[in-house]
């Protein structure tokens, strides 16, 4: 995965984070995902950690279908990178 792909994923997460309909608890988890992807670490480790955070959000009862769809798009970007 190149830095361009990581930046693209970070931008997608930031775009979702700016949505006013998203609960604060989910926004905090999205911020953690951005921090993980910004770390100086092996790319595959960053991807796995980020996917784990996505799973936590998906299991959250506050997550509505729109947010789940956006998270699936981000997960797809991570898995295809």
Where are these regions (language model features)?
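Peripheral, non-catalytic segments of secretory and membrane proteins
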Residues: 1-81
């Amino acid at each position: 995965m190149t830095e361009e792909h990581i930046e693209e994923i970070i931008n997608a997460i930031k775009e979702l984070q700016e949505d006013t309909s998203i609960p604060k608890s989910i926004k905090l988890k999205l911020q953690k995902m951005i921090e993980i992807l910004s770390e100086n670490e092996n790319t595959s480790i960053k991807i796995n950690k980020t996917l784990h955070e996505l799973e936590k959000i998906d299991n959250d009862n506050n997550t509505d279908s729109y947010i789940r769809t956006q998270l699936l798009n981000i997960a797809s970007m991570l898995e295809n990178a």
